[in-house]
Amino acid sequence: MNKPVAPNSYKTGPDEEGMFGIFGGRFVAETLMPLILELQEAYETAKNDPEFKAELNALSTYYAGRPSKLYYAEGLTKHLGGAKIYFKREDLNHTGSHKINNCLGQILLAKRMGKTRIIAETGAGQHGVASATVAARFGLPCVVYMGATDVERQKPNVFRMKLLGAEVIPVSAGNGTLKDAMNEALRDWVTNVEDTYYLIGTAAGPHPYPELVRDFQSVIGNEARQQILEQEGRLPDVIVAAVGGGSNAIGLFHPFLDDASVKIVGVEAGGRGLDGEEHCASMSAGRPGVLHGNRTYLLQNDDGQILEGHSVSAGLDYPGVGPEHSWLKDSGRVDYVPILDDEALDAFQLCTRTEGIIPALESAHAIAQAVKMAPTMGKDQVMIVNLSGRGDKDVHTVGKLLGMDI
């Protein structure tokens, strides 16, 4: 495919129709269109309102614990013997991941719109926990749709959601993973448009979700940019993040998109390899199609049916990706690469033993890419890896895979 001519800025999208080039848009049921337009109007008003910004900033600081630290991973750096590796510590946020950034922004939007019920989808459970958390904080009922497979492999997070007062509904359709949970959440939303706010957790879905999720998550990259300038006196050579739907990645990437000297790498779930269908590397092995209200790269068969996919990481187990990532791939600004389950598991253990930090399996995919790249770089070069979440939720999964009885 011919790459489009590089734009003057990579940060101007989406357009008024929610398109990033040929990706994005609003492919939704007629009953949802008025709600989507209402949400867009509410968001446009909110983001220009100093009071909204002040309230979000206060919650981010005093409730979520921002700014998150930019930490020099000295043990891992020395072990690999190449570039200096920094971790953006989103795992230290309240609820244990980057998900709280977006949830705080959206719960304030829901309040402005007068919505009285929150629904959400979740894969690894981190977005479900963050949604249940903000719903509890603002006294709203919350229903979380979660694939039955993910309910089984993320039991600690299921309990946390219930403890926070959310109703967790297992979805057994399909493979019982994130795609199926999102399908059910959309069905709920269509049925309950008057009082319900759908708090989407990733940078996908119909416009304006990819834009607003990106904007709420861009605090990651804005902080990291300022922090690396303070600590190293210059911008990084490389930034790396795991990509499922893509919210933590776009949050880190977006503020760096127009810095031509910064190489940007998104890491997809290579699962058990790209030869078969047991992976979730939609940009490495998929093609454009429409799912969950937007046009993007998808895993699909010759008839256009969506494939189920596989990843050891519940949060990367999604057969699509946010539309802005699809555009960034085709424009050539960001490189997207797959990491296998086994490589992520190795990186999970290596990070734990060299840094005393247990990363989420999603983040371990990004660390695995750092393990590959850092030794090929000079010791004077700098890399930032987004540590998007902590690994408490994954210890049972990892223990089982390593043959340990937990």
Curated annotation (Swiss-Prot):
Mind listing the GO molecular function terms for this protein? tryptophan synthase activity
The record's InterPro entries line, in alphabetical order, gives:
Trp_synth_b_CS, Trp_synth_beta, Trp_synth_beta/beta-like, TrpB-like_PALP, TrpB-like_PALP_sf
Where does the record locate the signal sequence feature?
none
Mind listing the UniProt keywords for this protein, alphabetically?
A: Amino-acid biosynthesis, Aromatic amino acid biosynthesis, Lyase, Pyridoxal phosphate, Tryptophan biosynthesis
Q: Which domain of life is it from?
A: Bacteria
Entry-annotated residues carrying N6-(pyridoxal phosphate)lysine: 99
Catalytic reactions on record? (1S,2R)-1-C-(indol-3-yl)glycerol 3-phosphate + L-serine = D-glyceraldehyde 3-phosphate + L-tryptophan + H2O
Similarity field: Belongs to the TrpB family.
On assembly, the entry states: Tetramer of two alpha and two beta chains.
Q: What is the protein's given name?
A: Tryptophan synthase beta chain
- Source species: Brucella anthropi (strain ATCC 49188 / DSM 6882 / CCUG 24695 / JCM 21032 / LMG 3331 / NBRC 15819 / NCTC 12168 / Alc 37)
Print the organism lineage. Bacteria, Pseudomonadati, Pseudomonadota, Alphaproteobacteria, Hyphomicrobiales
Q: State the encoding gene.
A: trpB
